[in-house]
């Protein structure tokens, strides 16, 4: 259960920038581990006895007092050999595939298909072994603590007559599974299951080449020809729109104020500083006009606050709806009301719903979803595609994560490192590493299995 508890990267960065929050998270994880170990016999007790859940919890808690360290050691004695075998197998096959990639290119694809199949089968067996052993440990403890009656672990299986037809059928089924899996692995390794994702510059910058959400940064980044430049806007005190991400201007401008407290004229007189660059804050009119001159499409995030005017969205649509549609721009927002309003009033304008955490797949009228990459899973992308919706991954700044998200078939990748993203995608298309693809497959599908 603890393996399923994932904190998004942007929250992790926020937490560990504040040491006291980091200590709190570590303490919570340790407490969760302690509870999981302490209550290990509870699951067998709930399954194999007729004791009401509340009484089962109370009895388990009482009987396991003083047994936590012994149980933890037993769990580690199961986990460590499995982890070591998995690591050695993965490293061994990775090195073998790397050798094939560099010295036996004609056999590299066949070798990758076989290696991936072997790795999947062995890891599945190890996972089953670990799960069964963990359950047996819990069952044994439940018996010792008299939470359940003693179990007869030796099942009596009646002998069956294995005639020729049965054997042929079994062999045929195995061959079918192996053949189907091999075709799937081949399609995955050759890129047949994935399309080229859109490249999207986060806040209009690439590797700190300017101040986020400003026109000079837009001009510099547009030279690299991203598919979209993502940017943010807020409503101002006089109900206009300014290009700004933060709800407080202090970090960028030194002014301790919020966008809704200043007029647009006051906002655009402020100077923003970041990454060694200095420039003026831009109105959305100025930024949009600059993007049109550059023929650069935008992905516009509409930021909302409780202080926004009731007519904000109607005003925005009246001013920009048809213009954005003509420019082939797109929108996204964390505010569900923004998404539904845009989809209702400007249905042809693609509008995405931003989700910082993906627990279940939502039912929305959005054109697609902007999903935080930490909790992004292939099953979520597949579900979106089945519903004719797109998925953008945000924010992906590491080349390994870029490869992973691309192989998961995300429709777009939002990044602060546009140059690295374009290089990574080029390498994937023109100089593929089957060894790296095997690792990406394992991490992608293990994430799906956990979710």
Predicted feature residues:
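Selective recognition of hydrophobic, aromatic-rich stretches within alpha-helical transmembrane segments
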Residues: 1, 14-52, 108-145
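Nonpolar helix-loop interface/hinge motif
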Residues: 31-99
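Membrane-interface segments at or immediately adjacent to transmembrane helices
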Residues: 186-238, 250-252, 257-261, 266, ...
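Structural preference for beta-strand elements that scaffold enzyme active sites
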Residues: 196-200, 228-230, 297-299, 328-331, ...
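Metal-dependent phosphodiesterase/phospholipase catalytic core, i.e.
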Residues: 245-349, 385, 441-450
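C-terminal active-site rim and adjoining tail of enzyme catalytic domains
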Residues: 354-451
């Amino acid at each position: 259960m603890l393996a399923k508890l994932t904190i998004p990267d942007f929250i992790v960065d926020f937490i560990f920038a504040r040491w006291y929050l980091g200590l709190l998270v570590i303490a919570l994880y340790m407490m969760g581990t302690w509870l999981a170990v302490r209550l290990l016999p509870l699951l067998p007790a709930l399954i194999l006895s007729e004791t009401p859940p509340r009484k089962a919890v109370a009895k388990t808690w009482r009987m396991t007092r003083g047994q936590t360290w012994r149980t933890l050691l037993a769990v580690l004695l199961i986990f460590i050999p499995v982890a070591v075998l998995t690591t050695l197998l993965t490293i061994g096959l990775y090195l073998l595939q790397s050798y094939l990639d560099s010295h036996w290119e004609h056999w590299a694809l066949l070798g990758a298909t076989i290696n991936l199949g072997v790795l999947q089968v062995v890891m599945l067996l190890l996972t089953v072994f670990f799960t069964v052993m963990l359950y047996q440990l819990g069952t044994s403890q439940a018996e010792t603590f008299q939470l359940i009656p003693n179990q007869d672990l030796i099942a009596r299986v009646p002998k069956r007559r294995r005639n020729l037809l049965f054997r042929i059928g079994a062999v045929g089924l195995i061959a079918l599974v192996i053949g189907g899996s091999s075709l799937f692995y081949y399609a995955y390794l050759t890129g047949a299951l994935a399309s080229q994702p859109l490249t999207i510059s986060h806040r209009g910058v690439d590797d700190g080449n300017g101040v986020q959400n400003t026109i000079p940064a837009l001009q510099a980044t547009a030279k690299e020809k991203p598919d979209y430049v993502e940017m943010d806007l807020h409503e101002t005190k006089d109900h206009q729109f300014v290009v700004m991400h933060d709800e407080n201007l202090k970090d960028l401008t030194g002014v301790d104020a919020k966008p809704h407290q200043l007029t647009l004229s006051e906002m655009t007189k402020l100077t923003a500083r970041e990454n060694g660059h200095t420039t003026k804050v831009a109105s959305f009119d100025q930024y949009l006009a600059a993007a049109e001159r550059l023929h650069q499409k935008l992905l516009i995030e509409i930021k909302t606050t409780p202080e926004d005017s009731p007519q904000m969205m109607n005003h925005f649509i009246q001013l920009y709806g048809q213009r954005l549609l003509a420019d082939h721009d797109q929108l996204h927002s964390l505010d569900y009301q923004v998404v539904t309003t845009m989809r209702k009033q400007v249905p042809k304008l693609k509008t995405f719903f931003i989700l910082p955490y993906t627990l279940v797949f939502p039912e929305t009228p959005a054109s697609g979803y902007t999903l935080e990459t930490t909790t992004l899973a292939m099953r979520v992308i597949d579900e979106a595609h089945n519903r004719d919706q797109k998925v953008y991954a945000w924010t992906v700044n590491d080349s390994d994560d870029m490869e992973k998200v691309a192989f998961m078939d995300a429709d777009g990748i939002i990044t602060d490192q546009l140059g690295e993203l374009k290089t990574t995608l080029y390498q994937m298309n023109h100089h593929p590493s089957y060894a790296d693809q095997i690792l990406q497959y394992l991490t992608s599908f293990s994430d799906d299995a956990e979710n």
